[in-house]
Amino acid sequence: WPVRSAAPSSSAFISANHFSSDDDSSSPRSISPSLASVFLHHTRGFSSNSVSPAHDMGLVPDLPPTVAAIKNPTSKIVYDEHNHERYPPGDPSKRAFAYFVLTGGRFVYASLMRLLILKFVLSMSASKDVLALASLEVDLSSIEPGTTVTVKWRGKPVFIRRRTEDDISLANSVDLGSLRDPQQDAERVKNPEWLVVIGVCTHLGCIPLPNAGDFGGWFCPCHGSHYDISGRIRKGPAPYNLEVPTYSFLEENKLLIG
């Protein structure tokens, strides 16, 4: 068998009609049909794989929606749910309306907050009627010694008694050990001449009668409690002495209660 060369020259694979050897340029070489078909197959495959569409050729590749939105951005569209229309951002008709609504809402909100704050502050300050009831000025110049006057303060009666020297001596001579609610007379008065007490019985809230009872002070007709000239309980069911309110002397003959 004749021996065939394992690797033919590259010039033989191209074509016998285009290339020839240096020794014999006039006689073309023949090529095997099987080798020519293999060479053409690989050449066509290489050419078809190497040629691909490029972006600069005007072809748009198929991209995912998110990538396409990033590479091809467009203006955002705002959907109007009320009119079922689409308006681009910053539409003049919608911008003016939104500005009016926001400004009006802020004004109304500020007005409501102002009213609430004023109402809260005014509610904390006392009215004139309350201030008038909180304190009471009493002129003492018309009260005679040994007499009692009754004034109204915070809806309660207040007894003001101008005591005589005998009244003062009698109040100081009482044995504290015999008292149900022991209290010295000096602890209950700021000026020995004047006794100021709230005219409400400490038993059940009745109003005692002045210049009555067994001890020359007050007597409660409801349940028979007796108070002395210093307003201390001496007899009866009342557990405590008559209450002494807060008071002060503005002048010699002017008293401020409260």
From Swiss-Prot:
GO terms for cellular component: mitochondrial inner membrane; mitochondrion; respiratory chain complex III. Binds 1 [2Fe-2S] cluster per subunit. Residues 119-258 are mitochondrial intermembrane. The keyword Cell cycle does not apply. The chain crosses the membrane at residues 96-118. GO terms for molecular function: 2 iron, 2 sulfur cluster binding; metal ion binding; oxidoreductase activity; ubiquinol-cytochrome-c reductase activity. Residues 1-46 form a transit peptide. Pfam families: Rieske, UCR_TM. It catalyses: a quinol + 2 Fe(III)-[cytochrome c](out) = a quinone + 2 Fe(II)-[cytochrome c](out) + 2 H(+)(out). It comes from the Eukaryota. Disulfide bonds join C206-C222. Its cofactor is [2Fe-2S] cluster. Its main location: mitochondrion. [2Fe-2S] cluster binds at C201, H203, C220, H223. Residues 47-95 are mitochondrial matrix. GO terms for biological process: aerobic respiration; mitochondrial electron transport, ubiquinol to cytochrome c; response to heat. Keywords: 2Fe-2S, Disulfide bond, Electron transport, Iron, Iron-sulfur, Membrane, Metal-binding, Mitochondrion, Mitochondrion inner membrane, Respiratory chain, Transit peptide, Translocase, Transmembrane, Transmembrane helix, Transport. It is a single-pass membrane protein. NCBIfam families: Rieske_proteo (TIGR01416). Component of the ubiquinol-cytochrome c oxidoreductase (cytochrome b-c1 complex, complex III, CIII), a multisubunit enzyme composed of 3 respiratory subunits cytochrome b, cytochrome c1 and Rieske protein, 2 core protein subunits, and several low-molecular weight protein subunits. The complex exists as an obligatory dimer and forms supercomplexes (SCs) in the inner mitochondrial membrane with cytochrome c oxidase (complex IV, CIV). The Rieske protein is a high potential 2Fe-2S protein. PANTHER family: CYTOCHROME B-C1 COMPLEX SUBUNIT RIESKE, MITOCHONDRIAL. Component of the ubiquinol-cytochrome c oxidoreductase, a multisubunit transmembrane complex that is part of the mitochondrial electron transport chain which drives oxidative phosphorylation. Belongs to the Rieske iron-sulfur protein family. This is Cytochrome b-c1 complex subunit Rieske-1, mitochondrial. It comes from Nicotiana tabacum.
